[in-house]
Amino acid sequence: MIESVMAVRLSTGFCSSTALLQYRTAPSSEEGGNCFHYASRRVFQPQRIHHIDGSGFLKYNSDYITRKHLRKNRTQATAEYVDSASDPEKQTGKSRYHPSEEIRASLPQNDGDSRLSPAETTRTIIEVNNKGTLMLTGSIGDGVHENILWPDIPYITDQNGNLYFQVKEDEDVMQSVTSENNYVQVIVGFDTMEMIKEMELMGLSDSDFETEDDESGDDDSEDTGEDEDEEEWVAILEDEDEDDDDDDDDDEDDDDSDSDESLGDWANLETMRSCHPMFFAKRMTEVASNDPVDWMDQPSAGLAIQGLLSHILVEDYSDIQKKLADSNSTTNGNKDAENLVDKLEDNSKAGGDESEIDSSQDEKARNVVAFYKLEMIRIQLITAQGDQTEVEVEDVRKAQPDAIAHASAEIISRLEESGDKITEALKSLCWRHNSIQAEEVKLIGIDSLGFDLRLCAGAKIESLRFAFSTRATSEENAEGQIRKLLFPKTNQSTQPKPK
């Protein structure tokens, strides 16, 4: 059964220069002047994720993430490995980087043989994941269009890597997908909504805690009232400052010692004039009440796919029918639930309750699943650091998914059962191979050629790649090579046997 999903409707051209997203109160029908409507209260403002000129691709700005995470003492770093830790001159010589960038100097040159090709990586990401985020444009009448961000839509694939999205047939969002308007973008691999929420919180600092201009057509009278209140508040503080100065003329020493702590002095600061304390407190509450994204758990790569979406009949696609049949045969719980529903329907028919029969039929109609095929036009491979690689669609269709990638989560789960032992082993691996003293480490992906490790050291988050000695041919072989890297055998000198 396909669960209903939430679609976020976003107005085109409605954006701010200070934040990626903003929460705004849902407008009432009496307010008027609003050129958009949406299914949730989140407005998409594509300032940090935007289209590349001439390509229409969704561009991911890594500088934005890096700059913002410096303020959180946890930033993302570039994936370019430009120096080697094995060079004694570079180890002992004067550092060419800022202390917060020292990780970059200790990373080795990246070996291309230790990674899957872009086409193989793309095909693997498509096969391993089963949900994607749709971005499409719909019309709301009178020539006004809206952007729709629709997360977590389940899909299945065929033998060529094509995507078939499963949507409830009564979803109103898909009514905007027509033969003339079926151009969409799909994001696969990243937890899109969580990352957008995090970027929204980080974007608050861009405004320097100033209120933004209301672009949705609301009345500016409230803003004017707030400005007047702020002016009165500052004027009162200045009056108190003057009174304090008159009262303390006889004691200049006390004035000097208390001037930094007096109310009037700190009220004259520029930050206090540009930000009302109530506004500051409100923003602090918003930041503190939201759980931040744990960037240590984010995958090493994701996809931005550009293509055309079209409705299909499953009967015309044998591959899809076979996959659906296999899925149904392995889901015993769903079968039992369907049998129970059938029995309940039979009982209701025997009782002659016409209303219950009609309601059950309506429920079945609402749960009818429609399939939409994505005809891929362009594909972009995006790393967690923001590096982007365009991959040919034909190469992706010819490539085969990695044989070990499907078992990656299970291998990681078994390794993490060791608890602190595996954590210390991963930290030791970073130190032995890259001379990096990691504070936090986490396995984020495994394939037949090696594994990706996410580490936090100081104010930076970095991803490292460790290659296997030989290509893994099975799940057990891959896990064995990982354990061999984490727990190397030490060569101990043989003790002579006593005579």
UniProtKB/Swiss-Prot annotation:
Feature: compositional bias, Acidic residues: 208-263
Phosphoserine modified-residue sites: 355
Keywords assigned by UniProt, alphabetized: Phosphoprotein
Tagged with keyword Metal-binding: no
InterPro entries: Haem_oxidase_HugZ-like_sf
Transmembrane region(s): none
Chain intervals with Basic and acidic residues compositional bias: 87-104
Record bears the keyword Phosphoprotein: yes
Region called Disordered, residue ranges: 76-118, 208-268, 478-499
Family annotation (SUPFAM superfamilies): FMN-binding split barrel
Biased composition range(s): Polar residues: 489-499
Official protein name in the record: Uncharacterized protein At3g49140
Lineage: Eukaryota, Viridiplantae, Streptophyta, Embryophyta, Tracheophyta
